């Protein structure tokens, strides 16, 4: 017996109200982050003003990994239960995750250009993130043919997540090591707060996209069934 939220009718009744609440949180956090990152956070002594792109680059990178883990969990649950909502969540996650990964690659290129002299290098971290982007696209492609195959493909793709995370430690890369870890941070608090605010904003934005996209898929399926 599934929890009520996994029933499409219950989801359609409650989800729009939740989306409105998330939109409010998203606007508030974004406004706070913009103010703190532009007018409060100081310039970096090495990169000057160019470093400010980290306020969107780093949270987007976190989201690209977090969404993939959530997508993999949803895929495992689909393989175990065959519940259609888990398949919808995985499909929606692949779309949103691909966008965040592409955004990470683009902003990373603009951040790296002043430091490396080029928008792209075949660095271990950059290459593994590019592979993540292609895995997202592959998951979307497989979803069109078989949900089971797509779910298995997504689970196999989990191998790439620790590679992305630890690539700067395992190999000699141009990408700087992580400035934030469980043991502390090398970033000043005035720079750290906007990063977490943007991350929270991206998190709520992802929730909004999940709700709206899943609602659209459910409605499309409903009208398709009704027309038959």
From Swiss-Prot:
May be involved in the export of heme to the mitochondrion for the biogenesis of c-type cytochromes. GO terms for biological process: cytochrome complex assembly. It comes from Marchantia polymorpha (Common liverwort). GO terms for cellular component: mitochondrial membrane. This is Putative cytochrome c biosynthesis ccmC-like mitochondrial protein. It is a multi-pass membrane protein. Signal peptide: none annotated. It holds the Pfam family Cytochrom_C_asm. One of its GO terms (molecular function) is heme binding. It is found in: Mitochondrion membrane. The keyword Transmembrane helix applies. Keywords: Cytochrome c-type biogenesis, Membrane, Mitochondrion, Transmembrane, Transmembrane helix.
